[in-house]
């Protein structure tokens, strides 16, 4: 931060605090807040996607990056126009990152404009990036110039500061993220889920976020399936209804296949019932309440549901 010269031992220069009246605020013309990826990722927004290791978080992050850079779509979300993206990857080997982007490129059918996606891949760095360190924040800043979306993959590898479950450990990264928002950028964090299924570490991360998405394993998920998950919006600021309802996504040979989470559950329940399982046995198999199984059976019996 530059500023007026300071005498030796004086406090570092800081911008003056600005207060305005309600009348001034109401008279202020703010530019409309656009969507980077509709309906859940706004411009100057802060969001997080978390899930178990190996479930498909990086697949999702790269798919989002490609959609935003090309003005395209990914899963059930749409980018209204092309925007520049910077991906900070702290975990994936370079060859794996290259392979996944090549796969996305082949299936997308549209190329990213030159320079619209730039990456800081872990394998290409001589040292790790740590967003909790002010020196690394300052070094990174020139590389973010012109970017609209910054994807941080992931918090555990790129924001190491103290103990992960302590709220204070998040504060330096939160300060950096809020600075990005003031600069007009959107930040999307990726994070791991803990053993209980919730995001790992302090829940204080969610305080300043617009959107929190959990990627969860469907009840019948098998490890060999790879990228297949249920998308759940745990925090949805500014949108609701159908746009915020959970759905399932699976990556196949031809690309991503989606279906409503309710329909997927009905299908699983009816399949188990067809195998002769009782309501109690189905509930135990899927790890849900009997009342939920009964509702699914009722829905599955409706005309046109199967």
Segments from the language model and where they lie:
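Conserved RecA-like P-loop NTPase ATPase core
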Residues: 41, 87, 153, 209, ...
């Amino acid at each position: 931060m530059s500023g007026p010269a300071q005498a030796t031992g004086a406090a570092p220069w800081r911008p003056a605090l600005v207060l305005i009246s309600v009348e001034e605020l109401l008279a202020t013309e703010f530019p409309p807040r656009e969507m980077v990826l509709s309906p859940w990722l706004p411009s100057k927004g802060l969001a997080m996607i978390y899930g178990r290791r190996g479930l498909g978080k990086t697949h999702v992050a790269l798919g989002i990056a490609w959609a935003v850079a090309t003005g395209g779509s990914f899963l059930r979300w749409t980018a209204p126009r092309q925007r520049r993206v910077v991906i900070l990857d702290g975990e994936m080997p370079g060859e794996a990152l290259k392979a996944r982007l090549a796969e996305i490129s082949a299936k997308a059918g549209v190329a990213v404009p030159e320079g619209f996606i730039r990456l800081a891949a872990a394998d290409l760095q001589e040292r790790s990036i740590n967003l909790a360190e002010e020196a690394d924040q300052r070094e990174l800043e020139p590389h973010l110039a012109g970017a609209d979306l910054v994807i941080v993959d992931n918090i555990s590898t790129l924001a190491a500061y103290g103990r992960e479950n302590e709220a204070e450990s998040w504060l330096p990264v939160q300060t950096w993220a809020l600075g990005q928002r003031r600069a007009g950028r959107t930040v999307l964090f990726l994070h791991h889920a803990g053993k209980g299924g919730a995001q790992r570490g302090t829940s204080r991360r969610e305080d300043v976020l617009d959107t929190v998405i959990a990627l969860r394993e469907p009840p019948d998920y098998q490890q060999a399936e790879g990228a297949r998950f249920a998308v759940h919006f745990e925090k949805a600021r500014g949108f609701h209804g159908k746009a915020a309802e959970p759905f399932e996504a699976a990556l196949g040979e031809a690309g991503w296949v989606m279906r409503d989470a309710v329909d997927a559950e009905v299908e699983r329940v009816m399949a188990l019932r067809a195998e002769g399982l009782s309501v109690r046995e189905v509930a135990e198999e899927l790890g849900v309440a009997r009342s939920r199984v009964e509702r699914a059976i009722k829905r599955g019996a409706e005309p046109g549901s199967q």
